[in-house]
Amino acid sequence: MNDLPWLSLLMVVPLTGAAVVAVLPSSSAALARPIALGSALVTLVLGIIATATSFTRGSTEQFQMVEQHEWIPQLGVSYSLGVDGISLALILMALVLVPVCILAAWDDAPEGGAWHKGYFALLLVLLPFMIGVFAATDVFLFYVFFEAMLIPVYF
């Protein structure tokens, strides 16, 4: 299980949930909340499993769960992710806070309100970008994730 691309998987799950929430028809807008919460909780569970199976506590100063793929070789830019002790703590904090935010907004509007789909979809889009910011080991990739993170925050 240590060969799984855990960090990329943690980014794909909420993006998939966001896509499902975004394409819900207006008549099913009430499903946005449970789908968003389910997606966030699945991501949290995957984060806990990844930490338990792939992170060695004795070497928190080294990058672990490393994924590296060439992206723009002419510029020396790569899709490079990894976590150390601090970045893992920040990722786990984000994974806990997103379900809390979803639960906090659970009753803020009438059932099936028009803003539910957009709010929950954008919150789920924000999560993988936060994970990317905390896990990026390439400065260009960090910049891309940080700037991408600002888009759902703006709306």
Which residues does each predicted region cover?
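Transmembrane helix-loop-helix hairpins at membrane boundaries of multipass inner-membrane proteins
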Residues: 1-6, 23-121
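Hydrophobic core positions of alpha-helical segments in small-molecule transporters
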Residues: 9, 13, 35-38, 121-122, ...
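N-terminal signal-anchor/start-transfer transmembrane helix
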Residues: 9-27
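Short conserved micro-motifs on helix faces and helix-strand junctions that flank
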Residues: 11, 81-82, 95, 135, ...
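Transmembrane alpha-helical core residues of multi-pass small-molecule transporters
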Residues: 13, 17, 39-42, 97, ...
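Membrane-embedded alpha-helical segments in integral membrane proteins
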Residues: 17-22, 70-78, 126-140
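Alpha-helical transmembrane segments of multipass membrane proteins
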Residues: 18-23, 48, 99-102, 128-132, ...
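Alpha-helical multi-pass transmembrane bundles of energy-transducing inner-membrane proteins
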Residues: 27-29, 118-125, 129-155
